[in-house]
Amino acid sequence: MLSVATRSGPFAPVLSATSRGVAGALRPLVQATVPATPEQPVLNLKRPFLSRESLSGQAVRRPLVASVGLNVPASVCYSHTDVRVPDFSEYRRLEVLDSTKSSRESSEARKGFSYLVTGVTTVGVAYAAKNVVTQFVSSMSASADVLALAKIEIKLSDIPEGKNMTFKWRGKPLFVRHRTQKEIEQEAAVELSQLRDPQHDLDRVKKPEWVILIGVCTHLGCVPIANAGDFGGYYCPCHGSHYDASGRIRLGPAPLNLEVPIYEFTSDDMVIVG
């Protein structure tokens, strides 16, 4: 008896097995098919018999791009002709679409365009930032009602000569004094060497007959009393500071003269403080 066994390996898709019976004294290589008896089970011929040969018949038999050798693992790579190659021409500039031309020829034009876009963008961003900063700063400024209280108009004809009138301005007392000619001459004759905070009377007034001061003592913030004290000006009852008719400190613990606010005479009979 002769038996042969072999493995086709990667050649299985192209090989097929056949057998032929020859009469002789030896045992046939393939036994003859015996009809099945009713007692034996009949195979379901409609169900495909899975084997290497049947599966190889179902394999795709298209042109191969790459084949395998005898001593390497079997693999098949097919050529795909339906794959679309990406094309980015729509996103590229016209100057660099031609691959046969050097990009140096159009570098100046492309750089100029880039600089132009950068410059326009920078100007736009700066303008937008300016508007944002302006709105932010404006939001922190005083409102209209606060600005209205920032200035006060005073009618000078309501203040008699030699008298002092007190007004409320920005939450502080405001002294407006109508000085006599004697007070004007007296304060102008004071030597600066006698003053703790040296300042001439003419430097503190715009018109000699009118003295405008903030009525807050420079020591601890008390409100002085007008037409009182040793110098006939203002006197702070808290700690005994004496000011003259020009608001200059003459005696007591106060270190500085009374503050002179910003004011302007709009007419002979009207002054605006603030």
From Swiss-Prot:
Binds 1 [2Fe-2S] cluster per subunit. Fe-S cluster delivery to the Rieske protein is mediated by components of the iron sulfur (Fe-S) cluster assembly machinery that reside in the mitochondrial matrix (including HSC20 and LYRM7). One of its GO terms (biological process) is respiratory electron transport chain. [2Fe-2S] cluster binds at residues 217, 219, 236, 239, 241. It is a single-pass membrane protein. Keywords: 2Fe-2S, Disulfide bond, Electron transport, Iron, Iron-sulfur, Membrane, Metal-binding, Mitochondrion, Mitochondrion inner membrane, Respiratory chain, Transit peptide, Translocase, Transmembrane, Transmembrane helix, Transport. Residues 79-103 are mitochondrial matrix. Pfam families: Rieske, Ubiq-Cytc-red_N, UCR_TM. The keyword 4Fe-4S does not apply. One of its GO terms (cellular component) is mitochondrial inner membrane. CDD domains: Rieske_cytochrome_bc1 (cd03470). Its EC number is 7.1.1.8. Residues 141-274 are mitochondrial intermembrane. It is found in: Mitochondrion inner membrane. The chain crosses the membrane at residues 104-140. It catalyses: a quinol + 2 Fe(III)-[cytochrome c](out) = a quinone + 2 Fe(II)-[cytochrome c](out) + 2 H(+)(out). Disulfide bonds join 222-238. Its cofactor is [2Fe-2S] cluster. Residues 187-272 form the Rieske domain. Proteolytic processing is necessary for the correct insertion of UQCRFS1 in the complex III dimer. Several fragments are generated during UQCRFS1 insertion, most probably due to the endogenous matrix-processing peptidase (MPP) activity of the 2 core protein subunits UQCRC1/QCR1 and UQCRC2/QCR2, which are homologous to the 2 mitochondrial-processing peptidase (MPP) subunits beta-MPP and alpha-MPP respectively. The action of the protease is also necessary for the clearance of the UQCRFS1 fragments. InterPro entries: bc1_Rieske_TM_sf, Globular_prot_asu/bsu, Rieske_2Fe-2S, Rieske_2Fe-2S_sf, Rieske_Fe-S_prot, Rieske_Fe-S_prot_C, Rieske_TM, Ubiquinol_cyt_c_Rdtase_Fe-S-su. It comes from the Eukaryota. It is an enzyme of class 7 (translocase). The Rieske protein is a high potential 2Fe-2S protein. Belongs to the Rieske iron-sulfur protein family. This is Cytochrome b-c1 complex subunit Rieske, mitochondrial. It comes from Pongo pygmaeus.
